Each structure stands twice: as structure tokens, then as C-alpha cells.
Amino acid sequence: MSPRSGLLIVLGFTLWRVVMLNFDATDFFVDEAQYWFWSQNLDLGYYSKPPMIAWVIRAMTELSGSNAIYWIRLLGPLIHMAAALVLMKTAKRFVGPEIEGWTGATYITLPGVALSSVFFSTDVILLFFIAIALLAYFGLTQRRSVGLALVMGLGVGLAFLTKYAVLFVVPGGAIALLLIPAARIAVRDVIIAVAVAAVVALPNLWWNLQHDNTTVRHTQDIAHWSELGINLRRGLEFFAAQFGVVGPIIFFAMLWAVYRMIRGRSDDREKMLVWLSMPVVLLITLQATVAKAYANWAVTAYVAGTILAVWLLYLKWPKGLRLSLTINGIASLLFPLATIFPHQLLLPNGDALMKRYLGRAEVSREAAALATQAGTDIIVTDNRDMVADLFYTLRDASYRIYARAPAGLPESYYEQEFALPADITGKVLFLTDGAFTCATETPEVLKNWQPTEGNYKGKTLSIYKVSATCLAP
């Protein structure tokens, strides 16, 4: 495949995704709604993530003049397109022009890329910055350059401001530097890159120190390091899920590259790509085995990993490269259709395939309507999913929205920054999916119901009119 053909495939899939977003019929997922809310309250850090995604969303909403779902999710395909173009140049510089087109076409059709081109996440931005850092790093292995060292440091620093998962690449990269002479760069360039990365990351590190290491503690919490125990099934499930994240043939090729390295059949460049990718998969598989890990936690492996797989397939199994592009390409074309027909695509148990992306805004609108009827403009909830959507869906209304104040440490950004103030008195509307009683009064039940589809299907939701003091921790 020529570079021109690869470029056309990248542009073609991007255009398809941009057009299909116009017909998206799903709600924001809780994380997307939260990222949007962060963008309305700019800071140097947040409860669960560094600040980059909020800054990027704010830039888009300012440029577009809209807070609509379309414009925010549009960032996904556009940034992935940019990452694909950077990877093409990286592959050309590190391997040669023969895989430049294949690298771009393969990356843009990865299942994980297809998914995050529809539902926006931090992974999208993270992959872009890692691609930039990798391009500069490979350049530095060939020549000394202050400019490339600055770019590498900037890429790593901005990746850190996006998601701390960039650090998963460090152990493998360090091993490559120790074992492979061709992987080493000039000491001066290392110092420059590290210094720039540190300066870029410093504002978020300072923010964490000022907020009791909130983001760091949250990262530890979701990793479940306090509940360590060997569970081989979890590890195997995570490992198997990687065949779905990048496609079966691409992940197989990455494993094949490891086998080749162990058998002494790979050259230094192939070894470098292995060390910059597969240790990430190994680390997160270990994390899944002893605690917990989500399928996308190893995503940082698939920047270098894509180049590695494409190169090996190009040399040893060209038919596999074409087959992979066909399989992943078809899946990538079909996936946006699931967001256009979310109510029609059902699983065998009757649930919508897009269940967790449906029914959220409807609950928020119901709460708003009942608040108006009840004569209050204050809506409180103890559910993170609900408060996230309340802020987004009711963004143009005048309701005052709060999370119920926690009894201990906050467990979300909303409890941390937007908990119900103690000085609020009088009646408020309380939305919950759990049982609720008050010691000092009998709450007035405005509505109890069970949604028939979407994220809250099968759950009993309740809306009460109650004194604010009843919601005190």
C-alpha cells in the first residue's frame, strides 16, 4: 500500500465517522458528561484525571460556539486522524516508506480507535501525544537534536497531563535503553526531554499536592490495590480482551514479535518496538490478575505496537495484513451505526446494545419537571451518573444542582466541589436509586418508577421533596 493510499483510507474513515456523528441518538456516558463539566470549570487538575481533556473540550466548545454532543464527540475522529498521520511519519522514519500507508490505515481501523471515535475519552488525546513523543524519540536515536528533544519532552509532558497511564511505557522503555545500544539517545537530549516533561507536568503535580493527592488516591482506588489477591481468570479475561481492542491479527502479530525476540530472530529496531509496547500489556495483565483492570488500560502499548505489528506482518505475512485491515475496517464502518439505531440493536436478553448510553437525559428532564412542579430550583442526588447528566442536560436551565454531601472523603468530583452546602435550608428535590428515609420528617414521594430501557433499566428510581437538612451527612 502506498502512503497516498494509506492517507486516503485515514481521511475516508474520518469523514465517515464525522458524518455518522450527525445521526448519533445516544446520550453522553457519565465520563463524557463529567469531562464536559470540567471544561466549564477549568483547573490544573480534577478528582479522577489530569486536566488536558477539559482544556481540549473547552477549546472545541469555544471554537464551535456549542456545547452539543456532536461537537464534543467530533474531537474523537479528528484527533485520531492526527495521531494516524503522526504514526505514518513515525513508521516512515523508523522503518521505511513501505509500511507508512499500512500503519495509518491499520491504526485508524483499530477497534479501540473506532470505539473512541464515537464516545470521546482521554485515551484519544493520550495516544496522539504518545505518537508525537515516539516520533521525536526515534529521530533522536538517529541524531542529536535539541529541537527533537524539546518535542519529545513536550509530548511526554502533555501525555502526562492527559492520563497518568503514559507512565506504563516507562519500564519497557528503560529496559530498551539498557539492553539495546541503538535505543540510546544523547545524554544532553535525555536531560532536555526529561526537564521539559517535568516542567509541563509540574502544574498538575502542584495541584495534587494542594488537594491532598486527590487524583493519585483515586487512581489507587480504581486499581483496587487495597484488595490484592490472585485471580487468574481476571488476568486471562483482560489478556483475551486485547484481541478485541486492536483486532485479533494485530495482537497476534505483537505476540509473534515477542516470540521472535525470545528466539533471537529480531533486529534492534523490532526489539525496541517490542519493549515500547508489550511490557505495558504484561504490567496491566498482572494488575488485572492481582486486583482489577479495564480492557483499555493497556492502550499505551498500541502506539509502538501498531508499527510493530504492521512491520512484522508486512515482512512475514502480507496476506494477514490485508485480512486484518478488512476485518477491522468492516467493524469500524459498522460501529457508528450502533449509535444511530441504539434502540433497535438488542442483545439476546432484551437489553439494548448501547444500554449504558441511553435513558440518562430522560431521567434528568423528569427530575427538572418535578422540581418545577414542587416549587424548588434545587436538585440533589447521591448518584454520580445522575449528577453528571443533570449538569449537562439542564445546562441551559436555572436549576441549582448538587451532589449529596459525603460523610467521609469525597468519592467523586461532584462530592468534592459541588456538594450540597450546609447553609441551604428549605425543601429540595432529591433524586436517588436507593432507599431513603429521614429521621426528622417523612419525605414526600413525588415519583417512583422503573425505566423500561437504557442505563437505569430494572432499577427503581425515586424522586422526593424533602428538607435539605435530611440530606446532611
Swiss-Prot record:
Membrane topology: Multi-pass membrane protein
Single GO molecular function: pentosyltransferase activity
Membrane spanning residue stretches: 6-26, 68-88, 94-114, 118-138, 160-180, 190-210, 238-258, 271-291, 295-315, 327-347
Places the protein is found: Cell membrane
Organism, scientific name: Rhizobium johnstonii (strain DSM 114642 / LMG 32736 / 3841) (Rhizobium leguminosarum bv. viciae)
Pfam families assigned to the protein according to its UniProt record, in alphabetical order: PMT_2
Broad enzyme group: transferase
Main location: membrane
GO cellular component, one term: plasma membrane
Pathway: Bacterial outer membrane biogenesis; LPS lipid A biosynthesis
Keywords assigned by UniProt, alphabetized: Cell membrane, Glycosyltransferase, Lipid A biosynthesis, Lipid biosynthesis, Lipid metabolism, Lipopolysaccharide biosynthesis, Membrane, Transferase, Transmembrane, Transmembrane helix
Phenotype when the gene is knocked out: Cells lacking this gene produce lipid A that lacks any detectable GalA. Inactivation of this gene also results in a product that is affected in the addition of GalA to all positions in the LPS core oligosaccharide, possibly by acting as a less than an optimal substrate for RgtA, RgtB and RgtC. The mutant strains are more susceptible to deoxycholic acid and to the polycationic antimicrobial peptide PmxB when compared with the parent strain.
GO BP, one annotated term: lipid A biosynthetic process
Entry EC no(s): 2.4.1.-
Stated name of the protein: Lipid A galacturonosyltransferase RgtD
Cited function: Involved in the modification of the lipopolysaccharide (LPS) lipid A moiety. Catalyzes the transfer of a galacturonic acid (GalA) residue to the 4'-position of 4'-dephosphorylated lipid A, using dodecaprenyl phosphate-GalA as the donor substrate. Acts before the other GalA transferases RgtA, RgtB and RgtC.
